[in-house]
């Protein structure tokens, strides 16, 4: 569960290392985001020669949460930390590589690109 002010690691090669959630998109009073939800983020830590700079605002999709996701068969998939992939205004990934596993819940029409780039789909 990600909420405003939550810090997430970045799971792509855009040059951002850490981002902070500044808004959960989808509804005026929506408080939490989980895997597959789109959030608005601010870059808090970036590498020197990356595509993105510290302080810039982007859309991002949550790909891993410590809270996890419950499957239809009753199983629960949890991760060690929270991670997101940065998106442009057309909701396409900015980076060309994805690091770490992602869940099958991202296999919607919108995020097939992320699933195809990921090294492992759980």
Curated annotation (Swiss-Prot):
Tell me which GO cellular component terms the UniProt record holds. cytosolic large ribosomal subunit
SMART domains named among the record's database cross-references: Ribosomal_L14
The highest taxon in the source lineage is: Bacteria
- Gene Ontology molecular function, alphabetical: large ribosomal subunit rRNA binding; structural constituent of ribosome
Any Gene Ontology biological process? translation
Which InterPro entries does the record match to this protein? Ribosomal_uL14, Ribosomal_uL14_bac-type, Ribosomal_uL14_CS, Ribosomal_uL14_sf
Quote the Pfam families the UniProt record gives: Ribosomal_L14
Which keywords are on file for this protein?
Ribonucleoprotein, Ribosomal protein, RNA-binding, rRNA-binding
Q: Which HAMAP family match?
A: Ribosomal_uL14
The record's family statement is: Belongs to the universal ribosomal protein uL14 family.
Cite the record's note on assembly: Part of the 50S ribosomal subunit. Forms a cluster with proteins L3 and L19. In the 70S ribosome, L14 and L19 interact and together make contacts with the 16S rRNA in bridges B5 and B8.
Q: What does this protein do?
A: Binds to 23S rRNA. Forms part of two intersubunit bridges in the 70S ribosome.
What protein does this entry describe? Large ribosomal subunit protein uL14
